[in-house]
Amino acid sequence: MSKVHLIESPYALDKIKGIGPKRLALLEELNIKSVEDLVLYLPTRYEDNTVIDLNQADDQATVTVQGEVYSSPTVAFFGRNKSKLTVHLMINHIAVKCVFFNQPYLKKKLELNSIVTIKGKWNRNKQEINGNRIFFNDQKNQEDAHLEPVYRVKEGIKQKQLRDNIRQALSDVTIHEWLTDDLREKYKLETLAYTIQTLHHPIDKQNLLRARRTYAFTELFMFELRMQWLNRLEKTSDEAIEINYDINKVKQFIDSLPFELTDAQKVSVNEIFRDLKAPIRMHRLLQGDVGSGKTIVAAICMYALKTAGYQSALMVPTEILAEQHAESLMQLFGNTMNVALLTGSVKGKKRRLLLEQLENGTIDCLIGTHALIQDDVVFNNVGLVITDEQHRFGVNQRQILREKGAMTNVLFMTATPIPRTLAISVFGEMDVSSIKQLPKGRKPIKTSWAKHEQYDQVLAQMSNELKKGRQAYVICPLIESSEHLEDVQNVVELYESLQSDYGNEKVGLLHGKMTAEDKDQVMQKFSEHEIDILVSTTVVEVGVNVPNATFMMIYDADRFGLSTLHQLRGRVGRSEHQSYCVLIASPKTETGIERMTIMTQTTDGFELSERDLEMRGPGDFFGVKQSGLPDFLVANVVEDYRMLEVARDEAAELIQSGQFFEQQYSHLREFIKQNLRHIRFD
């Protein structure tokens, strides 16, 4: 079937008036490559140019007012090519002086007794408006004098040019309707054609809100249709592996562990085991705070797979993390399981032998990085794929690993506790297990906040920990100094400063510009206590486990979000020793102060993630480009979570009733297939 589009155009992008080769190249830089892209390039905000009554305006407010020109404008030139135009208007029965700087050409346009609309800053005492925009009363400008769309543009493209291009395209395209008449009527929604037109050219605020609501619901509904369809495919597949593990051997393994499972771990194990026994493929997210013991839960599941005759795989984001997992699992399993490590560093004969053992079934459990998804990595009988910190992998990487075991069971793990509203959006098709309990014997990390002038006192506190034979992390937001952020400390300067205080051999440096090999070497030295202090950027945020590290200093902590601060803090507090986290910050904003205060009040990652989401929004919560969040143009999973729930219910009803598979929805089914390529629909 040919490509299905939401928007169809009778001509190509370069046929629109004013779009030549140069403009075409600039538009492509904005990711506008077709007429459909152009029409869906929505404004980022709107300038409110609604005319108001000047009698009601506050002093020093930016106002848009309409009045009659009652004096001829005058222009005074001064300085080098500078000018001041003065004109008097009668506005709402008030005589007002209006001034415009460096716009002398307006003199010819401002005719005596004409009606004009002016936008500028109102000075009540002087009865004067410092103007920055003027609208003359021809029809085109009248349209702009209400809610004016503002687009993200780049040098070489003007707002007006882009608005004109979009206006022409909108007059000629066909916009298909995805929502049924019944659904639109039920929730009082507009047609998509009217909605997109309005988002570009709103008549008023109420009209704009209705359009935004319609488009957001359409996006969420389409997203949920994809989720629900995927659910149906998962549950009706006859390829799913049913794991008949040996429960007695599993119990013996759990009893042999050198510690007792927490109640939360036991609940998670039982939930996963129920999934493994079911005749449908497991698709579960295991989320738990830093240090909550997710790896032990994963290990028990891997052991269960071994007793059932299946292999398991664990994919993690970094080599150092893969090595740590492999080492701890080898110790945990002893001779009961054959654990292997596959990273980019494993090469030549060693790699060939490992792949041979994997394919013939000698290896029970394979731990690795993205090296696991290479074409020559073939499993004998994989029954469980575990991905750690899954929002740090691209969707395609996860999909390839999953497909190495056809319809194998999938467990995703994350130490970033995800608020319920976001979990629905990111992992909507998954069941979720949460570990909200720390293992016995762990002491809560003591978190404090110090100002920059208290730095020496913080150093003294760190020195006390080092004297006990412990280790410390020192975290900085920047790698090198920045002219834009002169007051922000950088990691290289701080590293050099600490070297002079503690000696070159005792201080290590870690940042994102280093090669993977150099980073691993530094982390290895820190793990083996060859280094006392590790000065680093946030590259240590994920999964690094050095139990002897009990002190963390985070410099310029107000530069980080709550979730990042919490993940960083989680690098300490990983043993029975008391750990400390000191935030050094002198925040200048209310948000910065609030963030520091919250961090000192709670160590609950679930509570912090909710607060972080409220303060920063979903894109920042996960980090740009890594999030796995659906790429909505209008909808916001936090602000629109109630709408998301309604969309999910409606999508579930459409699929479960079977209506979705009728002829009338064939166009929609094909669109979802073609535009969500990372999902298998066969």
Curated annotation (Swiss-Prot):
Residues 454-614 form the Helicase C-terminal domain. Residues 50-145 are annotated as: Wedge domain. InterPro entries: ATP-dep_DNA_helicase_RecG (IPR004609), DEAD/DEAH_box_helicase_dom (IPR011545), Helicase_ATP-bd (IPR014001), Helicase_C-like (IPR001650), NA-bd_OB-fold (IPR012340), P-loop_NTPase (IPR027417), RecG/Mfd (IPR047112), RecG_dom3_C (IPR045562). The keyword Hydrolase applies. It is an enzyme of class 5 (isomerase). Residues 275-435 form the Helicase ATP-binding domain. ATP binds at G288, D289, V290, G291, S292, G293, K294, T295. It comes from the Bacteria. Its EC number is 5.6.2.4. The keyword Protease does not apply. Plays a critical role in recombination and DNA repair. Helps process Holliday junction intermediates to mature products by catalyzing branch migration. Has replication fork regression activity, unwinds stalled or blocked replication forks to make a HJ that can be resolved. Has a DNA unwinding activity characteristic of a DNA helicase with 3'-5' polarity. The wedge domain within the N-terminus inserts into the replication fork junction, where the lagging and leading strand split. Monomer. This is ATP-dependent DNA helicase RecG.
